[in-house]
């Protein structure tokens, strides 16, 4: 029998969630570096450069890769020969205590994003608990643990279908990838779960993306003439066909949309073909450890020389400098799709909860806490600052969630432009076009890099909303791209179509 101390599991979980907040898995970094070298799309290559630079900065500074430090997920396998002689908590409670310590660490506080009463008050639990824990009792004397942090943007793009046994699984996946847009922050990993029951398929898809990026090994195996299993065949087929869609980094169009595709399957009922799809984003975060009774887990610290020699800096010649303090609607209307801008001056922030409260206040005729006239709003929920920071990592959140508020903001508050990540939907694009506005995108997965452009930050409204409060940021050379111009042209539509043609593997869909 192996005796595991309660404190060893708690501290190991706490250490793991801190670790993954600032260290990408090296297999992901290696694959992303190779994708950078291959990439021919200037916009996609620039986005990958920002992600790689941000990753190294986070590793050096021990600050989060992404402002969305995720909901904690743990896969734990407990050996049947393990005992917990000093335990006063359940395993769920131990894991939750580890998460609580990690997210409240004063040296690197992580953003608390978990809300209780999800269909009601949606109140923040303040410590990012409870974690979502998947248990398995297995033969053995050890405890095997995977800790992962998944952000809301990639989780929102998860898909499930109960297909008929005769349906084409590959066609279903290829139909869903464009539907997902760029909110899951490609390039990343796609996990496919096949079989079992609906909940089993989803769990398989989620578990699959915890494995190392190793599609290159599978390609080599296929090239050697070795026989592949059906899941391996599907991995290769989907990897090639998804990348042939031309979605590209951040949905801007390019050669690499996925760095790997994972497939796990399980027997299912003869009448069903359950299929699940779960993406892992540019902020891929997971680590694996085991406990054998000898103490807390020891996590290997990666070497900075393992990162590619890629350093992104603002291109002051190619990008247009914009003074937010004097910006006019006429200037916004003149921006062109794909144009690179460097923003300087003061902007406001606001995301889901702030937009909902603004809508409620306008409906009641109440005065807003801040004047949005001729202002730009940044969709962001930053991490709290530490030491000499003015704000913690502050990357963009998914713009489409604010689509239903876009016309209201443009026509009732005086707002003239917005910044987020990913594409905008038809409702928002129509409002942008009607109001001669524009939507700008910042790179998802480059939160620490973006934060370095923020020179001051203060809460100016809705302080009770925590990370969803309205801030005023003063920025210097903050990099963005015009994603939707005043005529309604979206680079998230034009870019992938252009690169799908260039890749030339499949016809452009109507």
Short names for language-model regions:
Residues 341-343, 347:
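Generic structural signal for buried aliphatic residues
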């Amino acid at each position: 029998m192996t005796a595991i101390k309660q404190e060893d599991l708690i501290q190991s979980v706490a250490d793991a969630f801190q670790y993954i907040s600032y260290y990408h898995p090296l297999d992901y970094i290696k694959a992303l570096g190779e994708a950078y070298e291959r990439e021919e799309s200037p916009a996609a290559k620039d986005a990958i450069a920002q992600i790689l630079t941000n990753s190294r900065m986070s590793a050096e500074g021990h600050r989060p890769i992404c402002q969305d430090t995720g909901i904690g997920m743990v896969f734990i396998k407990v050996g049947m020969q393990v005992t917990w002689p000093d335990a006063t908590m359940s395993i769920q409670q131990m894991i939750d205590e580890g998460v609580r310590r990690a997210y409240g660490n004063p040296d690197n506080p992580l953003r608390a994003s978990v809300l209780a009463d999800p269909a009601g008050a949606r109140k923040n639990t303040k410590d990012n608990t409870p974690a979502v824990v998947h248990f398995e009792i297995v033969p053995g004397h050890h405890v095997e643990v995977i800790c992962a942090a998944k952000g809301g943007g990639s989780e929102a793009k998860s898909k499930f279908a109960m297909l008929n046994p005769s349906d084409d699984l590959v066609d279903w996946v290829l139909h869903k990838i464009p539907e997902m847009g760029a909110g899951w922050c490609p390039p990343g990993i796609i996990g496919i779960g096949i079989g079992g029951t609906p909940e089993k398929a989803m769990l398989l898809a989620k578990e699959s993306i915890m494995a190392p990026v190793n599609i290159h090994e599978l390609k080599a195996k296929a090239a050697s003439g070795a026989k592949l299993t059906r899941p391996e065949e599907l991995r290769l087929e989907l990897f090639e066909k998804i990348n042939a869609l031309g979605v590209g980094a951040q949905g801007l169009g390019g050669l690499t949309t996925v760095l790997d595709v994972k497939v796990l399957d399980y027997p299912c009922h003869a009448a069903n073909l359950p299929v699940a799809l779960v993406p892992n984003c540019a902020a891929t975060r997971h680590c694996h450890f085991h406990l054998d009774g000898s103490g807390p887990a020891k996590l290997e610290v990666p070497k900075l020389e393992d990162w590619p020699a890629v350093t992104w800096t603002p291109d002051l010649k190619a990008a247009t400098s914009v003074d937010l303090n004097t910006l006019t609607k006429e200037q916004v209307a003149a921006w062109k799709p794909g144009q690179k801008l460097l923003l300087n001056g003061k902007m406001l922030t606001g995301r889901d909860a702030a937009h909902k409260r603004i809508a409620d206040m306008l409906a009641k005729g109440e005065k807003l806490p801040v004047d949005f006239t001729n202002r730009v709003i940044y969709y962001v929920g930053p991490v709290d600052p530490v030491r000499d920071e003015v704000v913690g990592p502050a990357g963009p959140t998914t713009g489409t969630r604010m689509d239903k508020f876009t016309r209201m903001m443009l026509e009732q508050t005086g707002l003239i432009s917005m910044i987020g990540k990913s594409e905008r939907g038809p409702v928002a694009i129509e409002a942008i076009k009607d109001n001669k506005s524009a939507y700008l995108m910042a790179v998802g997965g480059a939160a620490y890099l973006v934060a370095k452009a923020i020179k001051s930050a203060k809460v100016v409204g809705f302080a009770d909303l925590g990370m969803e409060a309205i801030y005023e940021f003063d920025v210097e050379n903050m990099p963005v791209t015009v994603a939707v111009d005043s005529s309604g042209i979206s680079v998230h539509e034009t870019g992938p179509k252009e690169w799908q043609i260039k890749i030339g593997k499949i016809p452009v869909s109507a």
